Amino acid sequence: MDPTYSSESIYNLIPSDWKEPPQPPRYISIFKATVKDDMQKFKTAMKTMGPAKLEVPSPKDFLKKHSKEKTLPPKKKFDRHEPKKPPVPLRTEHPVMGIQSEKNFINTNAANVIMGVAKKPKPVYVDKRTGDKHDLETSGLVPKYINKKDYGVTPEYICKRNEEVKKAQEEYDNYIQENLRKAAMKRLSDEEREAVLQGLKKNWEEVHKEFQSLSVFIDSIPKKMRKQKLEEEMKQLEHDIAVLEKHKIIYIANKK
């Protein structure tokens, strides 16, 4: 019930016909068009769940003997396109035209072995008495990385990352200081304080004049509410005027 009207009324005794409230609008998802487009985009046309529908085999096509055995392709005759290579000569056969190599393979191999550099065995370590061998270089037992030139030096990418973090922190601090400077408290001058005080007093006089113009008899709810509203406004204005008259120095927040 609206507070501006009285709760008691003779019209309340009139019986009213009950009317069925209208149904709310049907819910329609906002993603309907998106889902429809996705289904048309990714769905395979004419695809079904499970095996496809096939024709029922006819009784005339009954199973015959050896019908499911795999049939081999017909054999083709092998045709040689290139002539055969000559066979390897026997040990008893002599070379054609008496051609022989004068190279002494035995002495050549012996000289290569004597003059060649001996292969160094791969360094290994044995961890058990049964002779289990493992690679020594990848085992971590050999001081490999501590002998590097850049061992113990901060990597370049970490230095670059630290500089970026430091620069970002400085920019953030400057941004915070700038916001604090903009939001600093501002002191009202004597002229501004006096202008605000006179404006409050003028507003109080206007509200008080309107309050004095009210009727003597307050016999309705709207009149009571109007009177209460004017009293609250006058009370707030009196409080603000008292604060400004009591304190000579006033600070306000700078909203710029």
Swiss-Prot record:
A motif (SH3-binding) lies at residues 83-89. Keywords: Calmodulin-binding, Cell projection, Cilium, Cytoplasm, Cytoskeleton, Flagellum, SH3-binding. Residues 48-92 are annotated as: Disordered. GO terms for cellular component: 9+0 motile cilium; acrosomal vesicle; axonemal B tubule inner sheath; axonemal microtubule; sperm flagellum; sperm principal piece. The keyword Cytoplasm applies. Residues 160-252 form the Enkurin domain. It comes from the Eukaryota. Residues 61-72 have a biased composition (Basic and acidic residues). One of its GO terms (molecular function) is SH3 domain binding. Residues 176-187 form the IQ domain. It is found in: Cytoplasm, Cytoskeleton, Cilium axoneme; Cytoplasm, Cytoskeleton, Flagellum axoneme. One of its GO terms (biological process) is flagellated sperm motility. The IQ motif is involved in calmodulin binding. Adapter that functions to localize a calcium-sensitive signal transduction machinery in sperm to a calcium-permeable ion channel. Microtubule inner protein (MIP) part of the dynein-decorated doublet microtubules (DMTs) in cilia axoneme, which is required for motile cilia beating. Microtubule inner protein component of sperm flagellar doublet microtubules. Binds calmodulin via its IQ domain. Interacts with TRPC1, TRPC2, TRPC5, but not TRPC3. Interacts with CFAP45. This is Enkurin. It comes from Sus scrofa (Pig).
